[in-house]
Amino acid sequence: MASQGTKRSYEQMETGGERQDATEIRASVGRMIGGIGRFYIQMCTELKLSDYEGRLIQNSITIERMVLSAFDERRNKYLEEHPSAGKDPKKTGGPIYRRIDGKWMRELILYDKEEIRRIWRQANNGEDATAGLTHIMIWHSNLNDATYQRTRALVRTGMDPRMCSLMQGSTLPRRSGAAGAAVKGVGTIVMELIRMIKRGINDRNFWRGENGRRTRIAYERMCNILKGKFQTAAQRAMMDQVRESRNPGNAEIEDLIFLARSALILRGSVAHKSCLPACVYGLAVASGHDFEREGYSLVGIDPFKLLQNSQVFSLIRPNENPAHKSQLVWMACHSAAFEDLRVSGFIRGKRVVPRGKLSTRGVQIASNENVEAMDSSTLELRSRYWAIRTRSGGNTNQQKASAGQISVQPTFSVQRNLPFERATVMAAFVGNTEGRTSDMRTEIIRMMESAKPEDLSFQGRGVFELSDEKATNPIVPSFDMNNEGSYFFGDNAEEYDN
C-alpha cells in the first residue's frame, strides 16, 4: 500500500508502476496520456465530429463518461442482474452537441460498451490501461470539487460545512485505486469511514462472516491511507486507535471528526495533479505530439504548456459569464478548488474570484435545458506562470479566514502563509479530551494552539516563467496577508447530486 512507508511518486501510483527512475516515470505517464488522446481522436472519427465539435468540453465529458461506464465492471454486473426498464445494460451513451445551421443541437447517442472497450484498448496498445481511466476519473473529480459544495454530505456525517477544504476527491469512485486515494482529502476519507461505522452500528452483520472479514480489511486499509496523510505523531497514533478498535462505533466517529477538524490547522498530505479533459490530449496527439517519447508529468510544467496552446470551447448559458466559466475549468484542470485564491490568481495572471461571485453554473448541461439558446465561447485556460504541484499540506499557521471556508488545502508549492481562522477552528475543541485518546487529543490541541499566523509554508518556493522549463529561477510572490483567500467564501454553489 502506498501509505505504508513505500513512498512512490504520484506518477508511479498513477501508472501502477513499481519504483522507476524519473525518465521511466515520465515515459509511462506519457504513454497513459497518449492513449487517452488516441482514444479521443478515434471517438471523434466514429461520431463524425468536426474539429470545432471535438474541442467542445461538453462533448469531451460525454466521451469520457462513456469509457468510464464501459469499464465499470461492478455496475455493469449489477445492471445485468437487476435489469431496469428502458435501460440496456450493454449500452452506454450521452449527449453530443453538434453545430447545425449556426445553432447548437443536442443528439443523444448510444454505443455498445463492448465497442467502446475495443476502441479504448486499441488506443492503448491492446491493454485495459486502468491508469488512464483513473486519470479521467480524477479530472471529473477535480471538476466536481471546483463546481459543487458538499455541505449536505458534510452535515449528514456530523461534520461542519466549513470544513469543505478537506473534501477533495469526495466524488471519486471507489475503484480509483492508489492514484485516487492519493488525491483524496482528509475529510473525504473520514466521511467514507464514518459511513462504514454507521452501517456497522445499524446492521449487526456488517462486520460478520466472510463478507464482514472483507469489510474489516477495507476498513483497516482506509484507516492506513488516512494515517499516511497525517504529518504528526499524535494524529497518527489516534488513527491507530481507530483502526484497532474491535467494534467501531460512536467513539471512533468522535475521534474521526476530531481528527478532521484538527486537519484544518495540522494539514494532511493530499496529492494534486493536473488532469486535463481528454479533448486536450486528443488535440496534442492529432498535432503530432508524441507523449511517450517526450515524456510527461502531471505535477510539473507539462500541463501548463499543453493548456498554453490548446483551444477548448464550452457551451455558455444565456446569463453566464464566459470568463467565469474559464476560471472554473482552469481551477479544475489544476486541481486548485481548495487553493488560496491569492496563489491561484498570481499563477493564472488574472484575478480569481470566490465561488459565490461566479456567474456560471457547472460545465455539464442537463437534458431539459434548451441548447439552441446557447452560444459557445473559448475557454481561457492559459496561465502567466507555472508552479510545481504539492503533495503535502504545507506546515501550518493562521490568519483571519472567511465565513464559508475556514482553511485551505494548498495545490501549488509556493511560499505563502496558510490562512485559517484559529478562533473558529479552536471553538470546536472545547472540553471533550477525556477517554482513551485523551493524551493524543491534548497533544493535538496544543500543537494547533501554537500554530503561528506569520509562519510561511513552502519557504523559498516560487512560481516559474513558462520559458523556465527546468524550474531554475523561482519567483517568490508577495501576498497581501489580509486578503480574502478562500474560494467557497459566501458560497451559493449548487450541491453535488449524483
From Swiss-Prot:
Q: How is it modified after translation?
A: Late in virus-infected cells, may be cleaved from a 56-kDa protein to a 53-kDa protein by a cellular caspase. This cleavage might be a marker for the onset of apoptosis in infected cells or have a specific function in virus host interaction.
Q: Where is this region: Disordered?
A: 1-22
Q: Where in the cell is it found?
A: Virion; Host nucleus
The GO terms this record gives for MF are: RNA binding; structural molecule activity
Motif Bipartite nuclear localization signal — list its residue ranges: 198-216
Alphabetically ordered keywords of this record:
Capsid protein, Helical capsid protein, Host nucleus, Host-virus interaction, Ribonucleoprotein, RNA-binding, Viral nucleoprotein, Viral penetration into host nucleus, Virion, Virus entry into host cell
Q: Which InterPro entries match?
A: Flu_NP
Residue span of motif Unconventional nuclear localization signal: 1-18
Task: Please give a single GO biological process term from the UniProt record.
Answer: symbiont entry into host cell
Q: Does the keyword Ribonucleoprotein apply?
A: yes
For this chain, the family text in UniProt reads: Belongs to the influenza viruses nucleoprotein family.
What this chain does, per the entry, is described as: Encapsidates the negative strand viral RNA, protecting it from nucleases. The encapsidated genomic RNA is termed the ribonucleoprotein (RNP) and serves as template for transcription and replication. The RNP needs to be localized in the host nucleus to start an infectious cycle, but is too large to diffuse through the nuclear pore complex. NP comprises at least 2 nuclear localization signals that are responsible for the active RNP import into the nucleus through cellular importin alpha/beta pathway.
Assembly, in brief, is: Homomultimerizes to form the nucleocapsid. May bind host exportin-1/XPO1. Binds to viral genomic RNA. Protein-RNA contacts are mediated by a combination of electrostatic interactions between positively charged residues and the phosphate backbone and planar interactions between aromatic side chains and bases.
Its name, as the record gives it, is Nucleoprotein
Output the lineage of the source organism. Viruses, Riboviria, Orthornavirae, Negarnaviricota, Polyploviricotina
The record's gene field reads NP
